[in-house]
C-alpha cells in the first residue's frame, strides 16, 4: 500500500502529509521511498554494476558512477561488479538489492527480511550499513522481520502483528 501498488480496503495512506492515491503526489513521493524484499528478483542477465546503473538512472542520481562504487565497496561487492546477478549467491543478491535501494538515498526504506539469506557475520555487517545510512541520512526504516534481535537493533518503535492484526 505504501508503494501505491495495492489500494487500501478502507482509509488512506499518507506519506509526509501527502495522500499516495493522489496521482500528482505519487511520483514525487515514490522518488524518495525504496523497498527491499527477498521475493523481488533482480534482472538476471545484467551485471551488478549494470543493475545499479539502471536504478540510478531511473532515480536521476547525480555522480552515479561514484555512488555505485561507494555502495559496492561498502557492501563488499566490488570484486563481483562484472558478474551477472543470475550467477550470484542469495546473500550476494541480497546485498545488491540493498545497494539498489540505497542508491537514491531514500527518505523511507521498506525492508522485508533484509538479512534472511545472509550468514550471521554478513547479516550483522548489513545491519550496520542500514543503521549508519539511516542515522547519517535521517531515513525512516519500516522493517518486517521475524528476527527480534534485528528489530531491536534497527527500530526505535515496534508494532507486532498476528494474522494481519496489530497486537502490540
Role assignments for model-derived ranges:
Residues 3:
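Helix-to-loop junction immediately C-terminal to a conserved catalytic motif
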Residues 53, 57-80:
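Conserved ABC ATPase "signature" region
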Amino acid at each position: 500500500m505504501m508503494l501505491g501498488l495495492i489500494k487500501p480496503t478502507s482509509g488512506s495512506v499518507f506519506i509526509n502529509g501527502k495522500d499516495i492515491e493522489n496521482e500528482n503526489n505519487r511520483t514525487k513521493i515514490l522518488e524518495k521511498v525504496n523497498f527491499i524484499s527477498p521475493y523481488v528478483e533482480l534482472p538476471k542477465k545484467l551485471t551488478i554494476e549494470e543493475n545499479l546503473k539502471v536504478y540510478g538512472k531511473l532515480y536521476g542520481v547525480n555522480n552515479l558512477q561514484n555512488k555505485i562504487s561507494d555502495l559496492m565497496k561498502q557492501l563488499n561487492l566490488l570484486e563481483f561488479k562484472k558478474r551477472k546477478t543470475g550467477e550470484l549467491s542469495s546473500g550476494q543478491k541480497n546485498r545488491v538489492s540493498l545497494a539498489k535501494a540505497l542508491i537514491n538515498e531514500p527518505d523511507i526504506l521498506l525492508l522485508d527480511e533484509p538479512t534472511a539469506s545472509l550468514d550471521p557475520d554478513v547479516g550483522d555487517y548489513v545491519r550496520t550499513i542500514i543503521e549508519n545510512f539511516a542515522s547519517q541520512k535521517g531515513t525512516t526504516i519500516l522493517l518486517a522481520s521475524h528476527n527480534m534481535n534485528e528489530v531491536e537493533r534497527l527500530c526505535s518503535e515496534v508494532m507486532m502483528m498476528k494474522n494481519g492484526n496489530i497486537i502490540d
